[in-house]
């Protein structure tokens, strides 16, 4: 969608964490970004000013709560408050990446469930809806008492790999850890490919002695995960696949954080190409073999469908050309 969207009572605002994806979303939706300013005082306090009226409007605030997580989260909370006090009709937040979603349970005694705390804070601030992309744990949706639309990136990845000819029985989709089996199976079903899993002994904290459940010998392997942080999970998994006879290894993740040193780790790993979405804007160096796949069209269409009260279900599937839609 490139023409100006007709309904001017919907407005998009971008905060500072990921302006590039916000600009793409705005262009795809045909809705220009609203005018606002955000600045940080010397003591760290954040000041926001909305530079146009939002009275009676439906507001969508775009912000990834990635590094620096707490600054970006507080900027979002302050913007929500500004919109509420300016008499916006509804305030909706678009989180291409939802920080703290990995803290979704008590893994050890006396640990907090910070994902629930953040959900409470956002809800209490006054939001009406959340649009996000590939939550680390889907149960985080249940931490909110408002609608949460968790969009999936697997259909985007399936379309990309199908165009590259990476599908069928010569390809195997691999989960680099047993917790990602569902994600791997989803991509494998789109590609008509088998799956494999890399598992580790409980005392293998460095993940160096993994073993493969499934057949990868003589096949092209696609590693899939939701968050690429330090790169160690993909790097070690790729080495295991190479030792096990995989001919080529590709990797794909929804969110490319690329924490310090990740580029060095991944560039020495036997990975042909790494695909991530543009959900996170990082200041760290990115490996040379990384390809960015934009999720902006997907998010833009979701925003328009929500505003027009249309179902989002068509966004959760990818139908390869030549397949019967019946």
Curated annotation (Swiss-Prot):
Q: Which Gene Ontology molecular function entries are recorded, alphabetically? A: ATP binding; kinase activity; magnesium ion binding; ribose phosphate diphosphokinase activity
Q: Where does Mg(2+) bind?
A: 136
Residue positions binding ATP: 43-45, 102-103
Q: What is its EC number?
A: 2.7.6.1
Give the co-factor note: Binds 1 Mg(2+) ion per subunit.
NCBIfam families linked: PRK01259.1, PRK02458.1, ribP_PPkin
Q: Which family does it belong to?
A: Belongs to the ribose-phosphate pyrophosphokinase family. Class I subfamily.
Q: What does this protein do?
A: Involved in the biosynthesis of the central metabolite phospho-alpha-D-ribosyl-1-pyrophosphate (PRPP) via the transfer of pyrophosphoryl group from ATP to 1-hydroxyl of ribose-5-phosphate (Rib-5-P).
State the oligomer form and interacting partners: Homohexamer.
Q: What is this protein called?
A: Putative ribose-phosphate pyrophosphokinase 2
């Amino acid at each position: 969608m490139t023409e100006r969207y007709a309904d001017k009572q919907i407005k998009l605002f971008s905060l500072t964490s990921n302006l590039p994806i916000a600009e793409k979303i705005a262009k795809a939706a045909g809705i220009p970004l609203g005018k606002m300013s955000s600045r940080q005082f010397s003591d760290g306090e954040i000041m926001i000013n909305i530079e146009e009226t939002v009275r009676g409007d439906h507001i969508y605030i775009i912000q990834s709560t990635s590094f620096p997580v707490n600054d970006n989260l507080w900027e979002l909370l302050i913007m929500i408050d500004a919109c509420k006090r300016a008499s916006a009709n509804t305030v909706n937040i678009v989180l291409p990446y939802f920080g703290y979603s990995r803290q979704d349970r008590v893994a050890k005694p006396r640990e907090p469930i910070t994902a629930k705390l953040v959900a409470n804070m956002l809800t209490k601030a006054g939001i009406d809806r959340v649009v996000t992309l590939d939550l680390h744990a889907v149960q985080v949706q249940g931490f909110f008492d408002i609608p949460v639309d968790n969009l999936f990136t697997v259909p985007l990845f399936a379309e990309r790999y199908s165009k590259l000819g990476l599908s069928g029985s010569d390809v195997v989709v691999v989960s680099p850890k047993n917790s990602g089996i569902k994600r791997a199976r989803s991509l494998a079903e789109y590609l008509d490919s088998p799956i494999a899993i890399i598992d580790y002994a409980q005392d293998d904290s460095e993940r160096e002695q993994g073993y493969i459940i499934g057949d990868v010998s003589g096949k092209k392997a696609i590693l899939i995960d939701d968050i690429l942080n330090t790169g160690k999970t993909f790097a070690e998994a790729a080495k295991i696949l190479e030792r096990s006879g995989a001919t080529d290894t590709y990797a794909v993740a929804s969110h490319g954080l690329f924490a310090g040193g990740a580029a060095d780790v991944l560039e020495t790993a036997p990975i042909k190409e790494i695909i991530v979405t543009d959900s996170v804007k990082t200041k760290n160096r990115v490996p040379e073999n990384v390809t960015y796949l934009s999720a902006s069209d997907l998010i833009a269409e979701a925003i328009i469908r929500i505003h027009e009260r249309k179902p989002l279900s068509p966004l959760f599937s990818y139908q390869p050309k030549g397949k019967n839609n019946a």
